[in-house]
Regions:
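Alpha-helical transmembrane segments of multi-pass membrane proteins, especially transporters
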Residues: 96, 100-104, 120-128, 430-438, ...
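Short hydrophobic alpha-helical segments that form membrane-spanning helices or hydrophobic packing faces
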Residues: 51-54, 99-103, 412-417, 495-496
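Active-site cofactor/substrate anionic-group-binding motifs, chiefly glycine-
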Residues: 57-91
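Hydrophobic or amphipathic alpha-helical targeting/insertion segments
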Residues: 106-150
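Glycine/serine-rich anion-binding loops at beta->alpha junctions
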Residues: 19, 88-98, 403-405
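Residue-level signature of catalytic and energy-coupling elements of molecular machines
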Residues: 44, 93, 117, 176, ...
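Extended amphipathic alpha-helical scaffolds
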Residues: 2-65, 71, 131-371, 375, ...
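Extended, low-charge hydrophobic alpha-helical regions
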Residues: 26, 72-74, 367-371, 375-545
Length: 545
């Protein structure tokens, strides 16, 4: 046994690469910082846009969630940071850029602490203490508000600042407030999904409107059917209105012409009885999830009904929410109680050739549609992203009734409080708490830099004003401190608390990793000039700017 001393024991396959300790932590931190840096310049009302190129398609946006979603990221730690943005977007719908910037800055500050031989566990503990304190400070500074139209409009406008749609901000803010108020009273975890957005190129932005119902990119199944139905009674059929084909290889042999006629007549009678059952229930509009055969189309047209086939499952559910109809599986069992209602169902020509179906005037609509008009598809896509952000924050304020000032004011107050809190701590955790304060303060610093002001001068001015009884944030026009509440620059409390939570979770998760083992893979084969055993981790492709 003694003879084996000093002999290395190999447990990994040849070609595997292992990095541990500070080397692993530094590389992981570098990857996280690269992600944060890629979207840092998009923060704020004067943030820059990014051009994302995929093949022949280009997307121009400064929406953090969109940028990170479109980036082709391979590094596992970088992917973890992207998950921060996804969690923020899924939970709140806004604040993704803030969360990622704070996460990147927390890791940058942690790197400095690691160089001072502060143990990662101590840093993690300090960050957790600071995050808990920050949540408390944010909650204490929150302002209770009523969900009146003026307040909600301020929230909506703040969420859309810097999205490149300033010319449409007033209209979009009004649409988001109206849509949110229309569905806010209904129960459901993801109630925002009850709002559908339809984009129509052409026309003026002011032509955009809300339909208390649903708009489908569909048209009537037959031109013989009426184009317009008033006082519509709507049936939603999960099945089909056509003769089903047999699943087996069975064949029917007909030897006489009269038998063929009888066979076809029998098929038609089946369809006729189904259409008669629909008519008897009182329906005059039928939406079918599957097909509507030619025979059924003819019978529906004779009855003066409008039929639409191959409606997606998602649209069927939205129709049910909007019209109050129930999804019916057996057409022969339909009753008047299964039907929904709408003041109007109409096929309309949109643009030069496209047609859409408008189901509007639903008396108790639990789903609404926002119809956006714009000069181009790119403008419409950016309008939709801005509208999505504003809808989410408006709905959050309607639920929580709590807001905080914007312009970096909450971060300044949190940073000052954390520095005071750090002075009460005795261990090395105080270093981590101070680092956390610096990381949070990077938000107003970045806002100033992106607005073209000297970030250090702006930060110094904000620090001098913070704690004087008002919520001073950065005035993006002057670079000087300004009362954000008085200026109407406000955000939902939950956007800020979730950003702190998401960023802290991501940073602490990265700091806990002290060993990276990468197995040999074909795609990691050495490149020209690279050592055969230098299997470095994949680089993170960045988007084209």
């Amino acid at each position: 046994m003694a003879g084996l001393s000093g002999v290395p024991i190999i447990i990994l396959k040849e070609g595997s690469k292992r990095e541990s300790g500070k080397d692993a932590q530094r590389k992981n931190i570098l990857a996280a910082k690269a992600v944060a840096e890629s979207i840092r310049t998009t923060l704020g009302p004067k943030g820059m846009d990014k051009m994302l190129i995929a093949g022949e398609e280009a997307t121009i946006t400064n929406d953090g969630a969109t940028i990170l979603r479109e980036m082709d990221i391979e590094h596992p730690v970088a992917k973890m940071i992207v998950e921060v943005a996804k969690a923020q977007d899924d939970e709140i719908g806004d604040g993704t850029t803030t969360a990622v910037i704070i996460a990147g800055k927390l890791l940058e500050k942690a790197e400095g602490l690691l160089d001072q031989d502060v143990h990662p566990t101590v840093i993690v503990q300090g960050y957790k203490q600071a995050a808990a304190r920050a949540q408390k400070v944010l909650s204490e500074m929150a302002v209770d508000v009523s969900a009146d139209e003026a307040t909600l409009s301020k929230i909506a406008r703040t969420a859309m600042l810097g999205k490149g749609i300033e010319m449409a901000m007033d209209k979009l803010a009004a649409l988001s407030v109206e849509a949110a108020q229309a569905i806010a009273g209904f129960e459901g975890k993801d109630i925002e999904e009850n709002i559908k957005t339809v984009m129509i190129p052409g026309g003026r932005i002011d032509d955009s409107s809300i339909i208390y119902g649903i708009v489908l990119e569909k048209e009537r199944t037959s031109l013989e059917m009426p184009r317009k139905i008033e006082n519509a009674k709507i049936m939603l059929l999960e099945g089909t209105l056509e003769i089903k084909k047999l699943d087996t290889d069975a064949k029917v042999t007909i030897t006489e012409a009269k038998n063929l006629s009888s066979f076809k007549e029998g098929e038609e009678n089946v369809i006729k009885s189904q259409v008669d059952a629909i008519a008897a229930a009182g329906a005059n509009v039928v939406f079918c999830e599957k097909g509507i055969g030619v025979t059924a189309q003819n019978y529906l047209a004779r009855q003066g009904m409008l039929g639409v086939r191959r409606v997606s499952r998602e649209d069927m559910k939205m129709l049910a929410l909007a019209t109050g109809a129930r999804l019916v599986g057996d057409v022969m069992a339909v009753t008047a109680k299964d039907l929904g209602s709408a003041a109007l169902v109409e096929e309309r020509k949109v643009g030069k050739e496209k047609k859409m179906l408008f189901i509007e005037g639903c008396p108790q609509a639990k789903a609404v549609t926002i119809v956006l008009h714009g000069v181009s598809e790119q403008v419409l896509e950016e309008m939709e992203r801005a509208l999505d952000d504003s809808l989410n924050v408006v709905l959050d304020v309607i639920r929580s009734r709590k807001i905080v000032p914007g312009g970096g004011a909450p971060e300044m107050i949190v940073a000052e409080n954390l520095r005071q809190y750090a002075s009460t701590l005795e261990g090395r955790e105080q270093l981590a708490v101070r680092a956390f304060a610096d990381a949070v303060e990077s938000i107003p610093l970045t806002l100033a830099e992106n607005s073209g002001f000297d970030p250090l001068d702006s930060l110094a001015a904000l620090r001098a004003k913070t704690g004087q009884g008002k919520a001073f944030g950065l005035d993006m026009a002057t670079g000087q401190p300004s009362d954000m509440l008085a200026a109407g620059i406000v955000e939902p409390l939950k956007v800020k608390t979730q950003a702190i939570k998401s960023a802290t979770e991501a940073a602490t998760m990265v700091l806990r990793v002290d060993d990276v083992i990468a197995a040999k893979r074909e795609e990691l084969a050495p490149k020209p000039g690279q050592s055969p055993h230098d299997y470095t981790m994949p680089q993170m492709p960045m988007p084209h700017y």
